[in-house]
């Protein structure tokens, strides 16, 4: 089964990256979909992925965790052909960011255990 899933990943088109637009827009209202990993004690989530369909039918994503990240919008130039692909790329980016945070000494917003929880959550979304 894993070999079959790996083949599906190989067939996925690469994300579409456009230059960042300094004066570009982000979604001001609610994005089409928001996935959150709740924090056990705080009001804000440990991790959040926003997905939104752009005017041309392509999907955009935004990723937040450990007090940082960005809101979904065309400003960031991150696009995918399908919602499924956008979710995959967002989860992959979140995993990469959480691994970078784990490698730093000061994880002031999330503990190492919480960062590992973020990684496991994002892997479950892929």
Predicted regions and their residues:
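Intrinsic disorder/low-complexity signature
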Residues: 3, 61, 103-105
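A short, exposed loop/beta-hairpin motif centered on an aromatic-Gly-Thr core
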Residues: 64-96, 100-101
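Intrinsically disordered, low-complexity segments enriched in small/polar residues
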Residues: 22, 27, 54-55, 60, ...
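Polybasic, proline/glycine-rich intrinsically disordered low-complexity segments
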Residues: 87-126
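Negatively charged, low-complexity tracts enriched in Asp/Glu with abundant Ser/Thr
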Residues: 1-46, 111-126
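Compositionally biased amphipathic helical and low-complexity segments enriched in hydrophobic
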Residues: 6, 36-38, 52, 88, ...
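Amphipathic, interaction-prone secondary-structure segments
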Residues: 32-66
